[in-house]
Amino acid sequence: MRFLGHASSAEGLHVHRPEEIIMLVAESGAGGVLDPQERRLLENTLRWRDLTARQAMVARTRMLGAPVDLPREEMLELLASSPHTRLLLYEDSIDNIVGTVHLKDLMCPPAGAWDARRVVRTVPFVPEAAPVAEVFAQLQRRRQALAVVLDEYGGTAGMVSVDDVVEAIVG
């Protein structure tokens, strides 16, 4: 195209597809140029666009949740015995999540009789097959820390947080 007076925007550049970069990273790791941690971080970063919510999520059996009508003191006890600051709240079963309650809302409840429904924070719901990159972007856009992951039947499969996404990349 240069002979027609059109310059290529990639002229002089070595452009690589992600698969080729992964191969270069693997070869650099095998050749001792990268240590194993650097290699894993680079490979995970390049593969994160292929990662799904299911692959990064915390399974429902490991989620911290409680019925929305649980007394406030019991919610506080659940959070006190865990490393978390948020508690998933559900109506009837874990398949019917209504949102989360934050520790600070439990510590400083609104005046009047306790009703978690008054302080519950909504959470987004995403399908298991949702790309982690899209889930991460949605959480950032909505300024939320976690999303509930739904299985193919609409039941709760698990949850994925910003920290889970970072962990999936960093390892």
Model-identified regions with their sequence ranges:
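Low-complexity, charge- and small-residue-enriched intrinsically disordered regions
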Residues: 1-16
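Soluble cytosolic regulatory domains appended to membrane proteins
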Residues: 12-171
